[in-house]
């Protein structure tokens, strides 16, 4: 299964239901339009600064946005490197 990017959540759970464009959101949270567009299009992750702004605007927490990003990053890393890491790293034996 493909990792869900926070931009997909932003678009499908927030922007679409509100009938809001990425450009309108960028103006509302005072960031460049490219930042929001890149997040919505899965080209950029959510930073702490953006998480604070989104949380303030939508009335949720910055942790909500950062947790989405961390979960996405971890799933992506697992898909990319899990087999290699299993080959390279042995579990520590119990004492």
What is the predicted role of each segment?
Residues 1-20, 64-67:
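A short, Lys/Arg-rich alpha-helix, primarily the initiator
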Residues 11, 64-95:
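Short, charged recognition helix plus adjacent turn
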Residues 17, 28, 57:
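Residues within the alpha-helical elements of helix-turn-helix
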Residues 21-27, 54:
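Short alpha-helical "recognition helix" segments of helix-turn-helix
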Residues 23, 34, 63:
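Key DNA-contact positions within bacterial/archaeal DNA-binding proteins
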Residues 30-46:
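Recognition helix of helix-turn-helix/homeodomain-like DNA-binding domains
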Residues 43-56:
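Short, basic-rich loop-to-helix N-cap that marks the start of a DNA-contacting helix
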């Amino acid at each position: 299964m493909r990792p869900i990017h926070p931009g997909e959540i932003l678009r499908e759970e927030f922007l679409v239901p509100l009938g809001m464009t990425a450009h309108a959101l960028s103006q509302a949270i005072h960031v460049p339009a490219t930042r929001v567009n890149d997040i919505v299009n899965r080209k950029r992750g959510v930073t702490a600064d953006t998480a604070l702004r989104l949380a303030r605007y939508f009335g949720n927490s910055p942790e909500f946005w950062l947790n989405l990003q961390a979960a996405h990053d971890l799933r992506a890393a697992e898909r990319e490197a899990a087999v290699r890491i299993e080959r390279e790293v042995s579990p520590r034996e119990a004492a």
